[in-house]
Regions:
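Membrane-interface interhelical connector segments
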Residues: 121-151
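Selective recognition of specific alpha-helical transmembrane segments in multi-pass small-molecule
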Residues: 12-14, 33-47, 102-127, 189-204
Length: 247
């Protein structure tokens, strides 16, 4: 079942990415609204069940784990930096930088809220032992009646996030391959990319993913850092070329 679900999600991501970046971006905006609304529901259900004493880090051992956790989180979030591969397909807008900063601030606020819910209901010790502490936390939420269980809602929202992430990855890989081959990537090569992503994702789908929480986040940071440095260097080269032409 996990393999079939992975294949289905990846096929949906390929179908969305095949429509081009504009259509993919519009679909992701709809996904964002759905995920945001779902998270607000989870927050409203969970905020009243927090044990605030569990949210404070009292011991030196707990405080010592904060830097490693922050670095791992940064590596996971760095996957969004792969969108830099798509800069050539977009145009800058007035106030775009401010809008990006506001969205990043909202994203980190939501992430902090999720961490607060997990710690306030599970505690740091139990959260470190379970595989998916957020889903474990959600399993204890709900009221009698229509909202008795929220796992189904969270699972559906999780799939939307996976589709968006895989679609972004396929678009970025397609752009990188087109740059390497110096020509557009057709549907045949896009199928090869999708198949390669599926094969690489099989260990995680089968539950054998020892590198997912360690090397993958750090790999994201390394790739995005190298990409940013390359773009900065290219920008300096263009400035130098302009100054030489003026001179």
């Amino acid at each position: 079942a996990p393999v079939l679900l992975t294949a289905a999600v990846l096929l949906l991501a390929w179908w969305m990415a095949a429509g081009g970046l504009p259509a993919f971006a519009r679909a992701c905006e709809v996904f964002l609204l759905a995920v945001g609304a779902g998270f607000v529901v989870i927050l409203l259900f969970g905020i009243f069940r927090l044990d605030w004493s569990l949210t404070l880090l009292w011991t030196r051992e707990e405080l010592a784990q904060v830097p490693a956790g922050a670095l791992s989180t940064a590596g996971t979030m760095a996957v969004g930096g792969y969108a830099l591969f798509l800069l050539g397909d977009v145009r800058p807008e007035a106030g775009g930088a401010d809008g990006m900063l506001r969205r990043l601030a909202l994203l980190f606020a939501l992430l902090a809220g999720a961490v607060l819910l997990v710690l306030g209901q599970l505690g740091s010790a139990l959260a470190a032992q379970v595989d998916r502490p957020f889903l474990q936390m959600v399993s204890g939420l709900g009221f009698e009646g229509a909202f008795q269980r929220l796992e189904e809602l969270v699972s559906a929202l999780w799939v939307l996030g996976d589709v968006a992430l895989l679609g972004l990855l396929l678009l970025c890989l397609g752009r990188l391959l087109a740059w390497l081959l110096d020509r557009p990537v057709g549907k045949g090569k896009s199928w090869l990319l999708t198949g390669a992503v599926f094969l690489l994702g099989l260990p995680a789908a089968l539950g054998d993913h020892p590198l997912a929480g360690t090397w993958v986040p750090f790999g994201n940071l390394a790739v995005v850092g190298l990409l940013v440095l390359t773009l900065l260097g290219r920008g300096e080269e263009k400035k130098l070329e302009k100054s030489e032409k003026r001179g």
